[in-house]
């Protein structure tokens, strides 16, 4: 417990030094066991934490020592632990992100690092000083490692405080760069982000995930797209990619030659094999999470091949998944 307390004290100070928090704002928490937690106390300044400012919680989110008062955001922290696999939570008020949230609906990543690490970050509406309806925060954090609360701050999760800290810091710097590029007064959603439009199946129905009809539609959409074929040709996209659905043990292998899909079969012998549960494949095909980000986070698992090798075809694959996300699924 002493090590966890020291870690929390250290990360609180670093958050303050990086100006990701000021005054008495923000709160930190972590799991200390299967059903036990440690959280900063009410009005505890993160820059100057001591062991007395840290509160042990039981499985109900109640202080083990009744004379202590936990952070007012404790219900949100408990909801996040219940709904995600978070081991540590960092909730702070980064000034750049806070200002950005007032004029945007989401953060759209620009750099490759942002796309790999945080993806598109939703901005959640809120009209109370504390998070009284954590459901939307939990939903966002199931698909993204960090979420933005409008006019309030960020919530980042990770296996450690370091991971949650780095996600928060990266997001603040990314927003800073967007402000620097566009100017705070004129910053708006990137004009190059078109509204998502779904293709409608001929019979008006949605495709069953990983059905033959669904996979055929994916192939046709890619081969019929001039940009995908150009990007694939430019990067010499020649490989075989297997997509695997865990629940039904369904596998499809898509073979690419010079940027064109030349074969689709139900084998599992691709150079690369990506496997995942239906929840995460649905999230990818519904544009809730980027495929590369889902793989980076372990929601989808690269069971064959190396991500670094796969990433050399990032541009055509990104285009393919953007097309595939327009195809309606059940």
Annotate the PLM regions.
Residues 1-213, 271-273, 286-289, 297-301, ...:
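Glycine-rich flexible loops
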Residues 193-330:
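Feature captures hydrophobic
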């Amino acid at each position: 417990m002493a090590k966890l307390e020291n870690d929390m004290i250290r990360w609180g100070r670093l958050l303050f030094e990086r100006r990701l928090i000021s005054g008495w704002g923000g709160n930190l928490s972590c799991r200390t066991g299967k059903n036990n937690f440690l959280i900063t106390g009410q009005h505890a300044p993160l820059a100057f934490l001591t062991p007395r400012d840290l509160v042990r919680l039981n499985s109900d989110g109640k202080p083990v020592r009744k004379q202590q008062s936990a952070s007012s955001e404790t219900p949100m922290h408990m909801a996040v632990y219940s709904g995600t696999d978070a081991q540590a939570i960092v909730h702070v008020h980064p000034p750049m992100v806070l200002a950005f949230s007032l004029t945007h609906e989401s953060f759209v990543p620009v750099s490759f690092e942002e796309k790999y690490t945080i993806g598109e970050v939703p901005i959640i509406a809120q009209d109370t000083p504390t998070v009284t309806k954590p459901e939307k925060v939990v939903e966002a954090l199931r698909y993204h490692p960090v979420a933005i609360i409008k006019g309030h701050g960020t919530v980042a999760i990770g296996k450690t405080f370091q991971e949650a800290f780095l996600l928060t810091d990266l997001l603040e710097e990314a927003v800073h760069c967007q402000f620097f590029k566009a100017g705070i007064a004129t910053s708006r959603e990137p004009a190059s982000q078109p509204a998502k439009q779904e293709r409608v199946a001929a019979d008006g129905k949605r495709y069953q995930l990983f059905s033959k009809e669904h996979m055929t539609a994916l192939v046709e959409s890619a081969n019929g797209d001039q940009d995908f074929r150009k990007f694939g040709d430019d990067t010499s996209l020649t490989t075989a990619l297997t997509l695997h659905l865990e629940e039904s043990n369904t596998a499809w292998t898509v073979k690419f030659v010079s940027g064109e899909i030349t074969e689709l079969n139900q084998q599992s012998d691709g150079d690369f094999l990506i496997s995942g549960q239906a929840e995460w494949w649905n999230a990818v095909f519904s544009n809730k999470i980027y495929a590369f980000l889902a793989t980076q986070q372990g929601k989808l698992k690269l069971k064959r091949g190396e991500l670094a090798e796969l990433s050399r075809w990032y541009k055509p694959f990104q285009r393919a998944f953007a097309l595939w996300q327009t195809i309606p699924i059940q």
